[in-house]
Amino acid sequence: MAQEEMEVDLPNLLGPMDSNRVSTSHQPLGSRQVLFLPPPITYSDDSEELFLGPTEPHDVIVLDSGEEAPAQVVAPTNPLQMLHGALEQLRQAAELRSSVRRTRVQRRSTRRQQRGGSQRTAGTSSRAALSSFFQINRTQGLAPTLEREERNTVLRTESLRTLPGDSSDETVELSEEEEGEGSSTDVDEVEINAGAAPPAEPAPEELQINVVEVQAEASAVSDSLPIPERVTLPLQIQTKQKTPVKLLSPVKPLPPEEDEGDTCAICFEPWTNAGQHRLSALRCGHLFGFTCIERWLKGGASKCPQCNKKAKRADIVVLYARSLKALDTSEQERMKSSLEMEQSMRRKAQLESAQCRLQVQVLTDECGKLRNQIQELKMLIAQHGTGTSVQASSSRSTISGSLSSSQGQHKYSFEKAILISQTGSCRVMSYCESMSCLVVSQPSPQTTLIPGCGIKKLSAANLKSSQYVPIHSKQIRGLAFSNRSEGLLLSAALDNTVKLTSLLTNTVVQTYNTGRPVWSCCWCSDNSNYVYAGLINGSVLVYDLRDTSNCVQELVPLGSRCPVVSLSYVPRAASEVFPCGGVLVGTLEGACFWEMKDDQYRPHVLPLEPGGCTDIQIESNTRHCLVTYRPGKNYNFVRGVMMELTSNRLNDSEDEYSCSCYPVQTFNAGSTCKLLTKNAIFQSPERDGTVLVCAGDEASNSAMLWHSGNGTLLQKLQADQPVLDICPMEVNQSSMLATLTEKMVKIYKWE
């Protein structure tokens, strides 16, 4: 930028006397020219005389120039012309001030909108501003100059009166870019402090142009002029560093969301319960807005944004929830675990208690037997007295033999095998103690003459088969005798009928049509006029023999409608453990005890293992039942679980009970179970209160006999085919056991 000089030539206005007093206003300073600014001019309150301002340090503007400054520059010789220059300076400063205010308002609004962004500061071109700031017309006359001075003084006074109201403590940063001919101006920083000058003594605006600030004391210019103070010119020069730019405070980061669980992890916006940005989830369980996760997966990212598990658009599930809150269930889970632990300990204690009761019962019976033997021996000794040594030795041998026989183990020995059917298809059997007759279901031996199925009668006295009795047209699935001495046989078959057959006449005396295949049947021990039929759909029909038309009641299953594989009646008993009477219904999914009271039935679901149940048999005297399970996921072998039936009074009532059961002993068999077999639980032939359990094992084609007290395997009765049914018998004070296969019956005797 070209450097311009400001020269004031007033040779005609000053005389030789005044010209000798004027000092040079331009002094060379290196390669720069220093321009001394005059002090501010003020008016006195008492008179209209013009006064120069007090002697104060002022700024000195150093103008760079590519050319060397002249050695001597003509200084202004008239103080009025110096006053004119100062007034011109103030006028231009006021104009600059108004433009600065407009720029400041614009900058302030822009800064509010772009708060937090980076600021770029730039200064105006100092040299261009200064060249226009200090230009004075050299050909200007004195009279017009004085008139213009008065006009500018008024303007200056009005502008200075407005300065305090417009002053601000903020620092305004102006950015301008000026282009000159063939060269570009440097960008400097300009700070304009509007509140620097007090209202009483207005001073020109302070310009900081990143250059040298000069302070000096002015010498007297003229003693003849009527001014109260002398005009001082700056003589002392000192340097000042650049004032640093006032930086804006950094933008504070926005506070995080108070509840980050309500925002989408992709766009960080709250999800909604309706619309496009509604709450959605992936298979991994992470939550997003629907549109966000849809765009995410469409963009080629086939993974969850949070866990990087594989995901696709079909995995997006819209959740219909107003809000999500994690429920603290730690206390609930802790209580559940403690409850399960308590229940397991209770079951263990019940099992130990039941085993102890069985052992006490066995030991009590054994003790009673020993006492009876001791009494018999004492009687023998009293009758024969102290005989010879031979008699004594024989007595000792008798005692030892009695003790050994009482403590020795008895077992079943094979007695006879009886062929029932050449073609097979035998299924179930039952024993009538009053007639000493064992009946076995079989297909008709003469299918052309007598089609269908019936029973074959076996005499338990001579172990011979007598004759075949036809009953049903399809396979027989259940046989049961009444406790009355009438010889009535109840049979259930797949031909949708339940029939009563008299063994005295070998004829069917009553037929009931059930409408569905019948899988099992039993008699009511408390009232022999009622019989039960278990259907394929899980229902149990109750028939009254005095009503020959229809069933009197239907017991509808509470759960799944699985076939009734077993029916057993539990008679009432004067027992504290289980005094209730009713029918025990066993299905493929579990068991239910229907308590009978005043010809009304109340169901009690027993807590058995879900699924896999093939048979349930009852031992009515000890209130134990045997539940057979086929192999499953948890066990790969056939299990027989002996359960003890229990009951608790409800609300201190004398007649209302809650019936249940718990396991006492478990017996393990082979790993094969393809047929629905029937097992047996009965009292030991020793009459000592011991309960024996006998179950068929398809893997070894045998019947396994266990002791229920300690769970030990007592005996293994071998067979040629899988054992389908087991029936204990009492014949002439002898205990026998019959096992049935598809073709024959094997008889074992307890010895």
Swiss-Prot record:
SUPFAM superfamilies: RING/U-box, WD40 repeat-like
Zinc fingers, RING-type class: 264-308
SMART domains xrefs: RING, WD40
Ranges annotated as biased composition (Basic residues): 99-114
Pathway: Protein modification; protein ubiquitination
UniProt xrefs under InterPro entries: RFWD3, WD40/YVTN_repeat-like_dom_sf, WD40_repeat_dom_sf, WD40_RFWD3, WD40_rpt, Znf_RING, Znf_RING/FYVE/PHD
Region described as Disordered: spans on this chain: 1-33, 97-188
Membrane as UniProt keyword: no
Cofactor: [4Fe-4S] cluster
Biased composition (Acidic residues): 167-188
An annotated Gene Ontology molecular function: zinc ion binding
Biased composition annotated in UniProt, kind: Polar residues: 20-30, 121-142
Cofactor: how and how many bound: Binds 1 [4Fe-4S] cluster.
Ranges occupied by WD repeats: 471-511, 513-553, 559-604
Chemical reaction(s) catalysed: S-ubiquitinyl-[E2 ubiquitin-conjugating enzyme]-L-cysteine + [acceptor protein]-L-lysine = [E2 ubiquitin-conjugating enzyme]-L-cysteine + N(6)-ubiquitinyl-[acceptor protein]-L-lysine
Biological process terms in GO annotation: interstrand cross-link repair; protein ubiquitination
Purpose of the protein: E3 ubiquitin-protein ligase required for the repair of DNA interstrand cross-links (ICL) in response to DNA damage. Plays a key role in RPA-mediated DNA damage signaling and repair. Required to translesion DNA synthesis across DNA-protein cross-link adducts by catalyzing ubiquitination of proteins on single-stranded DNA (ssDNA). Mediates ubiquitination of the hmces DNA-protein cross-link, possibly promoting its degradation.
Annotated protein name in UniProt: E3 ubiquitin-protein ligase rfwd3.L
Organism: Xenopus laevis
Annotated gene: rfwd3.L
